[in-house]
From Swiss-Prot:
Residues 1-159 form the Obg domain. An essential GTPase which binds GTP, GDP and possibly (p)ppGpp with moderate affinity, with high nucleotide exchange rates and a fairly low GTP hydrolysis rate. Plays a role in control of the cell cycle, stress response, ribosome biogenesis and in those bacteria that undergo differentiation, in morphogenesis control. Its EC number is 3.6.5.-. It comes from the Bacteria. The gene is obg. InterPro entries: G_OBG (IPR031167), GTP-bd (IPR006073), GTP-bd_Obg/CgtA (IPR014100), GTP1_OBG_dom (IPR006169), GTP1_OBG_dom_sf (IPR036726), OBG_GTPase (IPR045086), P-loop_NTPase (IPR027417). GTP binds at residues 166-173, 191-195, 212-215, 279-282, 310-312. This is GTPase Obg.
Length: 340
């Protein structure tokens, strides 16, 4: 299945139906009075977050979305029927952004959230509404109001507890494949992952959602490489699992490359909890591994873990689970109208 995480939409809510100017016409009733009905309300455009979706692919060929307009009123006090609402389902984690102002309209970060983005126009009034003691036969009616029109950007940010980051070919995909049921593509070449993958990991009595973020390279924040469009997915993660290929000539440089790109993209990302792991440790002698581990640990002033290609993952997974339980990570400042 394809993966699309950004799409522009043109939304047009339904127009309100026009009111009707009509008069009662019956035999032997010379002056029947007004009986024009009101116009129906235009349909709204509503977004709902659906936990069963994980891409915006279904909007690929549906960029212009229009709700039904309300029907016009009619004689005998018949009101027009309201236009049907358009319900658009999006994955959990989708943000709806006003294209012009670039402000976030809503952040649908929980399952089942519902938000009306474009409101249908009000229906016009029939001439019955204008009858009075001084005007018993009004011919006045009003037209329906136009529905809202909005140009929005849908942006999907993957929701996960842990984000696996690192340079291309650091072993991120294989780590996720081994510890979860995620069927990710694995190969010994850079950029194996070209879209974020999610995996569910059972750790003792808890479950951890882990995301494999595509490899990040120097100047990714400027659009270089495949990592650029996926940097935003890291914002949702509570903890970062930073994998570094131990065979890299300079493990400090490998770490700094990723760290700097995160900071340049969003400085809040480097404040997140991070576990650093030297991966593929079965490819070097123990003395070389120890030297690189100590070098990186001294640079970071914190513990660095080691992992072989087929090594036991449970210690790392348990550490992630424990940190998640204690985690009170700093959240990215996103306007949430549900909490406003």
């Amino acid at each position: 299945m394809g993966f699309i995480d950004e799409v522009k939409l043109c939304l047009k809510a339904g127009d309100g139906g026009d009111g009707c100017a009509s008069f009662r016409r019956e035999k032997f009733v010379e002056f029947g009075g007004p009986n024009g009905g009101n116009g129906g309300k235009g349909g709204n455009i509503v977004f709902i977050s659906d936990a069963n979706l994980n891409t915006l692919l279904h909007f690929r060929y549906r960029r212009h979305i229009k709700a039904d307009s309300g029907k016009n009123g009619a004689g005998r006090d018949r009101s027009g029927t309201a236009g049907k609402d358009v319900i658009l389902k999006v994955p959990v984690g989708a943000q709806i952004i006003d294209e012009e102002s670039e402000e976030i309209i809503v952040d649908l970060d929980k399952p089942g959230m519902e938000f009306q983005v474009a409101q249908g126009g009000k229906g016009g009034l029939g001439n019955t509404n204008f009858k009075s003691s001084t005007n018993k036969a009004p011919r006045h009616f009003t037209y329906g109001q136009p529905g809202e029109e909005k140009h929005v950007l849908l942006k999907l940010k993957v929701l996960s507890d842990v984000g696996i980051i690192g340079m291309p070919n650091a072993g991120k995909s294989k780590f996720l494949t081994r510890c979860s049921n995620s069927d990710t593509k694995v190969g010994d070449y850079p950029f194996t992952t070209v879209r974020p993958h999610l995996g569910m990991v059972k750790v003792d009595d808890s479950e951890v959602v882990i995301a494999d973020i595509p490899g990040i390279i120097t100047d990714a924040h400027l659009g270089v490489g495949l990592g650029h469009k996926f940097l935003k997915h890291i914002e949702r993660c509570q903890i970062l699992l930073h994998l570094i290929d131990v065979t890299h000539d300079d493990v400090v440089l490998a770490y700094s490359c990723i760290h700097n790109e995160l900071e340049l993209y969003n400085s809040d990302l480097v404040e997140k909890e991070e576990i650093v792991v030297l991966n593929k440790c079965d490819l070097l002698r123990e003395a070389e591994i120890l030297e690189k581990k100590n070098h990186l640990a001294n640079y970071l002033n914190k513990e660095v873990l080691c992992l072989s290609i087929n090594g036991d993952l449970q210690p790392i997974l348990r550490l992630l689970s424990e940190k998640l339980k204690k985690s009170n990570s700093k959240e990215i400042d996103v306007y949430d109208p549900f909490k406003a």
